[in-house]
């Protein structure tokens, strides 16, 4: 499983953990996802890993995208849709994480491996949203070539490093009420203004709004 400090938890995860808002149990989620993958016949390209905080669906990028592309292949959309059905009846927080190998060459579309992995993550998120997953409980992360599990020294290792991971948190995503703001606190007044400066100059001027 992917290694992150504190199990890869964000502030959202920390909040839900502190409040004990555990989502759907991993055993049930894993069964549903395994059935969806089996029905799609794509077990060769997808595997599932679990750690104390995350249930991770690792999807090989070769199944989802053409080389150096972030557009989901039409043939792969039904696979994502099946996974979405398995995730539709749970309330767990979901992250979509993008990874690449170290062979990407910047082109006119993507500047670097972070850019490519970010766009691929967003593309998968959008497919999940189209399939009915609430966008408010999803987020994307881009790791590019810098958080690989396998060595990039071999073709086999590079192939395994090119992936998108749909990671399901152990904790539920419960939206907190939005706070209504009618006026800015005095010490934050600068945030309502505009920042301006001259090209080539290190001087910055904050122009406060009325």
State what each model feature region is.
Residues 45-49, 54-60, 64, 79, ...:
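Soluble periplasmic/extracytoplasmic beta-strand elements of cell-envelope proteins
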Residues 58-66, 85-116, 139-151:
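Short, surface-exposed beta-strand segments enriched in small/polar/acidic residues
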Residues 17-24, 52-81, 103-109:
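Short, solvent-exposed beta-strand/turn patches at coil↔beta or beta↔helix junctions
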Residues 115-210:
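Periplasmic OmpA/Pal-like peptidoglycan-binding modules at the C-termini of bacterial envelope proteins
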Residues 26-43, 68-98, 102, 125-129, ...:
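Periplasmic peptidoglycan-binding/anchoring modules of Gram-negative envelope and division proteins
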Residues 74-75, 112-113, 183:
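Glycine-rich, phosphate-binding/catalytic loops in enzymes
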């Amino acid at each position: 499983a992917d290694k992150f400090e504190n199990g890869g938890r964000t502030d959202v995860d920390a909040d839900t953990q502190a409040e004990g808002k555990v989502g759907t149990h991993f055993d049930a989620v894993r069964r549903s996802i395994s059935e969806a993958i089996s029905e799609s016949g794509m077990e060769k390209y997808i595997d599932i890993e679990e750690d104390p905080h995350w249930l991770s669906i690792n999807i090989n990028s070769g199944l989802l995208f053409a080389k150096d592309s972030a557009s989901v292949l039409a043939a792969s959309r039904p696979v994502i849709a099946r996974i979405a059905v398995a995730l539709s009846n749970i309330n767990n927080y979901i992250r979509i994480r993008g990874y690449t190998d170290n062979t990407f060459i910047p082109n006119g579309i993507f500047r670097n491996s972070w850019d490519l992995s970010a766009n691929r993550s967003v593309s998968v998120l959008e497919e999940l949203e189209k399939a009915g997953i609430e966008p408010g409980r999803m987020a994307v992360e881009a790791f590019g070539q810098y958080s690989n599990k396998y060595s990039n020294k071999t073709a086999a290792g590079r192939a395994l490093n090119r992936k998108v991971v749909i990671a399901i948190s152990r904790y539920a995503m419960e939206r907190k009420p939005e706070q209504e703001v009618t006026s800015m606190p005095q010490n934050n007044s600068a945030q309502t203004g505009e920042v301006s400066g001259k090209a080539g100059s290190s001087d910055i001027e904050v122009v406060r709004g009325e």
